[in-house]
């Protein structure tokens, strides 16, 4: 099983090494800081490279064992890449707002998912028997529930691993995962604490290019895991009528060619 490859140059070009202003640092991140330049902390990429590799291995191994990965990133610049990565690797995501109790109170969350399914069915059936006002209200509910729960509606239970962008913003998600003993992979910037993170990726968590790179690598690691899982089950990917995440696998093959 080959992990997705990346180079130090790619990390540099994406700005992974740029931390925050030195006065905004969290001392818990000092072991991963190389130095400072123009009042900005610079992360030590010689540490980020092997740690990112370990994090990707955790993603791949989780999926290879049949586990579920939940991608979490609710801030503006992470929202798109998080959803895209999860969708192309047949995983799950939260990219709108973390709902308290998503993990620790899954029963209630699954009831909301059930409500979303019922609304979807009703709307697909033309919302018969509803007044215009009721229909509008239902459309609003549908949009709200879809934004909050659309990425986890098929998850079917708590995930086996969390992949997080911005530990400060997603502190509640990490706390819930810690409480349930769910391992956490996360990008940790110089202004954050790595506490509660099992697989730390020291890196910039604000730059769009850096976020896209992390998400793309994690998606590819998940796809590697899926290929391994199907291979172990004796499934020939070439014989499947509809290969899982077929488009993503084809893209990967094209990129390697």
Curated annotation (Swiss-Prot):
**Annotated keywords:** Ribonucleoprotein, Ribosomal protein
Q: Name one GO molecular function term.
A: structural constituent of ribosome
Name the GO cellular-component terms: cytosolic small ribosomal subunit
Which InterPro entries did the record assign?
Ribosomal_uS2, Ribosomal_uS2_bac/mit/plastid, Ribosomal_uS2_CS, Ribosomal_uS2_flav_dom_sf
Single GO BP term: translation
Q: One of this protein's Pfam families, by short name?
A: Ribosomal_S2
Instruction: Kindly give the NCBIfam families that the UniProt entry links to this protein.
Output: rpsB_bact (TIGR01011)
What family, per the record? Answer: Belongs to the universal ribosomal protein uS2 family.
Report the protein name in the record: Small ribosomal subunit protein uS2
């Amino acid at each position: 099983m080959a992990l997705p490859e990346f180079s130090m140059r790619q990390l540099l070009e994406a700005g992974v090494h740029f931390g925050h202003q030195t006065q905004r640092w969290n001392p818990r991140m000092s072991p991963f800081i190389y130095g400072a330049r123009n009042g900005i902390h610079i992360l030590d990429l010689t540490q980020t490279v092997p740690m990112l590799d370990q994090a990707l291995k955790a993603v791949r191994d989780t999926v290879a064992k049949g586990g579920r990965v939940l991608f979490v990133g609710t801030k503006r610049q992470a929202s798109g890449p998080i959803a895209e990565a999860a969708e192309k690797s047949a995983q799950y995501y939260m990219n709108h707002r973390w709902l308290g109790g998503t993990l620790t109170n899954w029963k209630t969350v699954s009831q909301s998912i059930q409500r979303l399914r019922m609304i979807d069915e009703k709307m697909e059936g033309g919302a018969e028997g509803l007044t215009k006002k009721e229909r509008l209200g239902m459309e609003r509910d549908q949009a709200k529930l879809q934004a909050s729960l659309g990425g986890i509606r098929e998850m079917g239970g708590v995930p086996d691993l969390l992949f997080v962008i911005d530990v400060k913003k997603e502190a509640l998600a990490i706390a819930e995962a810690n409480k349930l003993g769910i391992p956490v992979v996360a990008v940790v910037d110089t202004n954050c604490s790595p506490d509660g993170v099992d697989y730390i990726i020291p890196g910039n968590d604000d730059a769009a290019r850096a976020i896209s790179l992390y998400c793309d690598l994690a998606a590819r690691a998940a796809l590697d895991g899926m290929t391994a899982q199907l291979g172990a089950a004796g499934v020939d990917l070439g014989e499947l009528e509809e290969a899982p995440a077929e488009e993503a696998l084809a893209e990967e093959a094209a990129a390697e060619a």
